[in-house]
Amino acid sequence: MLLTLVLLPLVGIALVSTTHWNNPIVVNKDGSIVSTNVDPDAKAKYIALLISIITFVFSLSLLVLFDPSTPEYQFTYAFGNKEALNTVFTSDFQLGVDGVSLYFVVLTTFLFPISFLASWKMKSAESDQYNVKFYLCTLFVLETLLILVFIVTDILLFYIFFESVLIPLFLIVGIWGGSPNRVRAAFLLFLFTLMGSLFMLLSILALYYNVGSTDFNMIHQYAIDTNVQKLLWVGIFISMATKFPLWPLYSWLYRAHAEAPVAGSILLAGIVLKMATYGSLRLLLQFLPDASYYFSPLVQTLGVMSVIYASLVTLRQTDFKVLVAYSSVGHMGIVVLGLFSNSIQGVEGSIILSIAHGLVSPALFMLVGSVLYDRFHTRTIRYYRGLVNYMPLFSVFFFLFTIANAGVPITGNWIGEVLCMMGAYQMNPIAATLTASGIVLSAAYSIWLFNRITFGTYSNYLNYTTDMNRREFNVILPLFVLTLLVGLAPNLIIDNIDISVSSLLY
């Protein structure tokens, strides 16, 4: 099943790359040239959307067939003969999912149909007929790599796919970004995260030297000396702290978000940052538990500083996308606080908050980076006022996702934040209390933002416009429904991850 899940996006690449480009320029019999409104890339877009939906539906079968009563890897698949592979690679190309990785796989496959719909207005110029097809294929490559990050059961392969994700991200930001600064933002994204991951590579090589294997199960069963754990932990944590990102390693994130196309922002906030959550769970908490406990006060301090600093900086932002990007830094700080609380509630809360953030943040990027920007072509907050008069449906959804981002009850963010705070309070009451103040600040900037752009007289800087169309509504509605579902029925997630989390910690 997992092999099929990996191959489906590759099938999408093959189909999209072979579609015919429909020239929107028509030459009449009299020699006159007429430009039509036909989208020349419509066929490729429909194929990409269909394949991504099939991939998502197929991933749901994993959710239905998953057995939550065991912490073992399920739906496992091994490539070829193990002994033959070991003579060349010293690692096993095996696939499998457990409760920790299951929902990250489903979240990945869910966000790609959303991303394809969000990119629907992109068109190829006549001088570059392959631009959109290349873009769609790049998204499929990114989906394949992200799925592999969450399902490989070998630490060396995990590192390879973890870093390979940077290549399509670099292309998405650098080629299809929104301004001339996109190339600089793409290089900053690539180099910043790559430099952090070099330390993880050194730790993985040292881990192989000590254990003699890169297989997850073998590493988990091996008793590593505590002092060695600490050295390995530092190298891996630097990479994860850059990817979350934590203060002070966040500067690449808001620049990448500001320049990325809306689909790039959706995927970057929705699932790419969650690789750090999964990597911390798997590599730090599971393989290096003694070192994780030893360094937890330091990590929780960084988490608290990230929450408070990001919330304060967000209050001063004038750019929509940068504001939402900084709010992501704050939420991931709470995730870190729960991860290193050494409690089941905290770790489960961090997973739920990661999933909820992977729904709310993409919705906000869609609303401000696509719905508003496509109409008014500016992300400057001070230009907006009185949108409720002409865009009531947008205003309703923007209000709902703004308060969800602030962590109000019956939303997934609230459940995740409460569990993270409960777990953190047991270990570090001061850190939990300070983080609560950061959550109050997040409510402050959320309410200010909604009030600023929605109410009052309509801004003189803006042209009169229409409300959300059907495509935009179809993108936002599933995100809203799932956000409520996670908030109202968190047991749907907790029941499937409880045994795996308990086994991971104890």
Residue ranges and their predicted role:
Residues M1, L15-C137, S502:
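Transmembrane helix-loop-helix hairpins at membrane boundaries of multipass inner-membrane proteins
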Residues M1-L8, V97-T108, I155-P168, Q229-M240, ...:
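Structural signature of hydrophobic alpha-helical transmembrane segments
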Residues I13-T18, L60, F116-L117, T144-L148, ...:
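Alpha-helical transmembrane segments of multipass membrane proteins
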Residues A14-S35, P113-E126, L171-N181, F244-A258, ...:
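C-terminal ends of transmembrane helices
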Residues N23-I25, K29, D39-A44, E72, ...:
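Alpha-helical multi-pass transmembrane bundles of energy-transducing inner-membrane proteins
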Residues D67-D92, N181-R184, S197-S251, R255-A258, ...:
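Juxtamembrane/interfacial segments at transmembrane-helix boundaries in multi-pass membrane proteins
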Residues Y254-A256, P261-A263, L273-G358:
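Acidic, glycine-rich loop-and-beta core segments that form the ion-binding/anion-interacting portion
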Residues S361-F365, I430-Y464:
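Predominantly late transmembrane helices and immediately cytosolic-facing juxtamembrane segments
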